[in-house]
From Swiss-Prot:
UniProt motif (Nuclear localization signal) ranges: 301-316
Residue ranges of domain SAND in the record: 193-273
Predominant place of localization: nucleus
A molecular function (GO) term: zinc ion binding
Organism: Pan troglodytes (Chimpanzee)
Region spans: Interaction with LMO4: 403-478
List of residues that carry Phosphothreonine: 171, 179, 432
Protein's name according to its UniProt entry: Deformed epidermal autoregulatory factor 1 homolog
Length: 565
């Protein structure tokens, strides 16, 4: 009963109405426990307005928003939610619950309408509102408009007018989503700020200095559908821009403008919906009596091919070279981007003690990453010395190789371990601080010194052998070149002699024919042969006879010699 009285005081009702409200609320609570809920109907007089104003500013554990209009008794309906019980007192301090009262069927004048001041900064400063609370208060029944009051958690109030009111009175429970704005007022969903006239069916458009009127219901694909009226003629968008001298643009969406912006902006905001090129509707066919399916234009974007290379250059991973210094032999590790490690030369470890080396990682073409403080440790299982590296061969060295075991302090694990400490990238290896080496390290260096000399001697010998082989190959190539030049010169001389022998005896030109009688004289043509025949006819036959006679005489002499023997 006390909770009901406090709720009645919050609502600003009179003492007589408070008793009725308490009874109605108690009845509603009892009905809710039994499974049914009834809405209490209250009536009040006009004299209770002052009480409502005075009681609205009291601090209560629940915020109540009331919209009251002066009217005759029996024309007010109030919907209230259940009041908090004793167990909900703690929860009411943390969350605010709103009770909405809607007054309908009001026929009084506008000056009799008033609004209670319960939703002001002074009264709600001590309350905690969850999110935002929207209160709709009806001004009058004749004009279907309402006032939207948004109460923020900081107590500020934002009021907007000119919104369309709900068709049905509000009921307790979850509030329905707000009514969407009219098409002329839907400015929040567009990219550009348009005048409300943009939603009209006719839009004044312009292309350069030609103006016309665009009819939305006749808009087609652009090339079809005469939707722009200029004077007494109808044009399609492409025809309209061609008439304005922009036929070469081939883009009517940007050539034709409305309110200073191209029609492409209207299309992006969904105000204009051009049809596809394959549309067969009445507008595209320029026949409003036809009826066909409407196919809207769907903008498309170019898709990247799967095998297309990215625009940003991809950094090519170059192999890294790792050199351990100082070492008994200069050994280089090459780490490829795929993770494979290759070595150049033989890797040797001084097993007498730990080898403190400096690992230099160089990457080309950029500066190299430098790592210092690398400690190389080997397992207690010792393979045969130089067993896996047959070259270079050291005579009498493999058999006399002495291996000293690691000290126990230098074997933390049973596997080789390399620890790298990152340093800033430098062009040269960082200098290692000089410090006194332990005696074991000195002994190890002394023991490994003969190995270095042997390796250097073997390297020098191999270099000398290689140089000798290169020198021999060079001499052979030089002799071969000399022989080739001599053969070329000889062939040239022989060719010149043959060419000189085959020259025409009459004119000296290159001869292609020869005398069939003696086969010793060459001619370039029949003209030269006829011209030289006067002198050659005496020599051609005589030379043949003389030759035959000489042969016969020679044969006779040989026979005579044989007979004599």
């Amino acid at each position: 009963m006390e909770d009901s009285d406090s709720a009645a005081k919050q609502l600003g009702l009179a003492e007589a109405a408070a008793v009725a409200a308490a009874a109605a609320v108690a009845a509603a609570a009892a009905a809710a426990a039994g499974g049914e809920a009834e809405e209490p109907v209250l009536s009040r007089d006009e004299d209770s307005e002052e009480d409502a104003d005075s009681e609205a500013e009291r601090e209560t554990p629940r915020v109540t928003a009331v919209a009251v209009m002066a009217a005759e008794p029996g024309h007010m309906d109030m919907g209230a939610e259940a009041l908090p019980g004793p167990d909900e007192t703690a929860a009411a301090a943390a969350f605010a619950e709103v009770t909405t009262v809607t007054v309908a069927n009001v026929g009084a004048a506008a000056d009799n309408v008033f609004t209670t001041s319960v939703a002001n900064a002074a009264s709600i400063s001590g309350h905690v509102l969850s999110g935002r609370t929207a209160l709709q208060i009806g001004d009058s029944l004749n004009t279907e408009k309402a006032t939207l009051i948004v109460v923020h958690t900081d107590g500020s109030i934002v009021e907007t007018t000119g919104l369309k009111g709900p068709a049905a009175p509000l009921t307790p429970g979850p509030q329905s989503p707000p009514t969407p704005l009219a098409p002329g007022q839907e400015k929040g969903g567009t990219k550009y700020n348009w005048d409300p006239s943009v939603y009209d069916s006719e839009l004044p458009v312009r292309c350069r200095n030609i103006s016309g009127t665009l009819y939305k219901n006749r808009l087609g694909s652009g090339g079809r559908g005469r939707c722009i009226k200029q004077g007494e003629n109808w044009y399609s968008p492409t025809e309209f821009e061609a008439m304005a001298g922009r036929a070469s643009s081939k883009d009517w969406k940007r050539s034709i403008r409305y309110a200073g912006r191209p029609l492409q902006c209207l299309i992006q905001d969904g105000i204009l919906n051009p049809h596809a090129a394959s549309c067969t509707c009445a507008a595209c066919c320029d026949n409003m009596t036809l009826s066909g399916p409407v196919r809207l234009f769907v903008p498309y974007k170019r898709r990247k091919k799967e095998n297309e290379l990215p625009t940003t250059p991809v950094k090519k991973d170059s192999p890294k070279n790792i050199t351990l210094l100082p070492a008994t032999a200069a050994t280089t590790f090459t780490v490829t981007p795929s993770g494979q490690i290759t070595t150049s030369g033989a890797l040797t470890f001084d097993r007498a003690s730990t080898v403190e080396a400096t690992a230099v990682i160089s990457e080309s073409p950029a500066q190299g990453d430098v790592f210092a403080g690398a400690t190389v440790q080997e397992a207690s299982v010792q393979p045969p010395c130089r067993a896996s590296h047959p070259e270079p061969h050291y005579p009498g060295y493999q058999d006399s190789c002495q291996i000293a075991p690691f000290p126990e302090a230098a074997l933390p694990t049973s596997h080789p371990k390399i620890v790298l400490t990152s340093l800033p990238a430098l062009a040269v290896p960082p200098p290692t601080p000089t410090k006194a080496a332990p005696p074991a390290l000195v002994n190890g260096l002394e023991l490994s010194e003969p190995r270095s000399w042997l390796y250097l001697e073997e390297m020098v010998n191999s270099l000398l052998t290689t140089a000798q082989q290169l020198k021999t190959l060079f001499e052979q190539a030089k002799h071969a070149s000399t022989y080739r030049e001599a053969a070329a010169n000889q062939a040239k001389i022989h060719a010149d002699a043959e060419r000189k022998e085959q020259s025409c005896v009459n004119c000296g030109r290159e001869a292609m024919n020869e005398c069939t009688g003696c086969h010793k004289v060459n001619y370039c043509s029949t003209f030269c042969q006829r011209k030289d025949w006067k002198d050659h006819q005496h020599i051609c036959g005589q030379s043949a006879a003389v030759t035959v006679q000489a042969d016969e005489v020679h044969v006779a002499e040989s026979v005579m010699e044989k007979v004599t023997v």
